[in-house]
């Protein structure tokens, strides 16, 4: 089996995006916070599937 490394790029967190648009306070009023807080960590990587990669 082969290991493929996917480069990750840090994206804007949901918390930061909501704050920039002035929506964080409203979001906090109606949202429950899960035990695992992932609002401040967003990483993305491009994945290609198939031959040729698409």
Swiss-Prot record:
EC assignment: 3.4.23.4
- SUPFAM superfamilies, sorted: Acid proteases
The residue ranges crossing the membrane are: none
Domain of life of the source: Eukaryota
Propiece span(s): 1-27
Q: Please name the top-level EC class of this enzyme.
A: hydrolase
**What does the record give under GO molecular function?**
aspartic-type endopeptidase activity
> InterPro entries annotated for this entry?
Aspartic_peptidase_N, Peptidase_aspartic_dom_sf
Q: Name one Pfam family in it.
A: A1_Propeptide
> Is ATP-binding included in the keywords of this UniProt record?
no
Q: What are its GO biological-process terms?
A: digestion; proteolysis
The UniProt similarity line reads: Belongs to the peptidase A1 family.
Role, per record: Chymosin is synthesized in the mucosa of the stomach. The enzyme hydrolyzes casein to paracasein.
Official protein name in the record: Chymosin
